[in-house]
Every structure is written in C-alpha cells, then in structure tokens.
C-alpha cells in the first residue's frame, strides 16, 4: 500500500535501514528501496498450512531466498490454469528462470497436517510426481529460480504469482 501513495519529501526521513517481511513483488522492489531509503530488505515465504518455507537472509534483491525443504517447480499452463504433463502423463520440472508451480515434498521431516476438511486436504496433495508413491503439497504459487551470484550452490527463488481465482493487492 505504501508504494501506491503519492510521494512526499519526508519519506526518506525515517530511522529504517532494514525491513523484514513478505509479499514485496519483484517489479516494485527497486523503487521501494530507493523511495524509502531502505538498504537491506529480507523476505520470507511460507503459509500456515504449508510444509515449505523460504528465507532471503542474504539481502539478495527481488528474491524470497533459499529453501531448506524439498522444493520442486513444475511446468504450469497459466492460460488454461493447469499443470503441464509430458506425453506419458508425468510432471515436467520447470527450467531455470521459467515460472513453475511450487510443490513441497511431503515426508517425515516436512509433513502436511492438512485441513479440518479431508477432501480439501486431499486436493492439495499431488502424488507420484517424481516417483511412484511420493506426495507433494501444492502451494498454488508460481515461483522461478534466479541467479543471485553466489548462493552456496543452493537455488534462490523469486515469487511470480498466485494461481487460480485469488485476491490481488
């Protein structure tokens, strides 16, 4: 909401030099930093029901950071609002830099406890994604991997958009 307000000379006259939060779109990242005089912006990504989260603690611009969990981006057709499968009906992993649907691998360490409605819980779990019998939490978000220079050989991700019929800020 701040970036949509009319500019005023006092905006940079604040004591903030760093902020921590989530939801800052990449297309307004640079403008936000410059306009409000913010040197360090740390982002995080996650959901209360999800089994996967990200943290940008290294101050890499326009990124939600790294994931300690089992993240997978699969090809997604935005126009038709559906996952893209290969000719054998298998999921296709998104290429580097290509937006893909974020899935979080469900296992003993990264569990999905579900909702109070079992049918709703079942709809969020995709099965046999990489191998027979596996389970993946469908976040409903499109992300892409980006190059941030050094990253300890751990991929960095950028938020792209929510899929489906969702409220937009």
Describe the predicted segments one by one.
Residues 26, 56-57, 86, 125-129:
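Short secondary-structure boundary micro-motifs
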Residues 1-77, 91, 111, 115, ...:
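Gly/Ser/Thr-rich phosphate-binding loop
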Residues 7-10, 79-87, 128-131, 147-152:
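Alpha-helix termini
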Residues 92-169:
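Conserved ATP-binding/catalytic segment of the ANL
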Residues 37, 43, 80, 135, ...:
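Generic secretory/membrane-interface signal
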Residues 69, 73-106:
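Glycine-rich phosphate/pyrophosphate-binding loop
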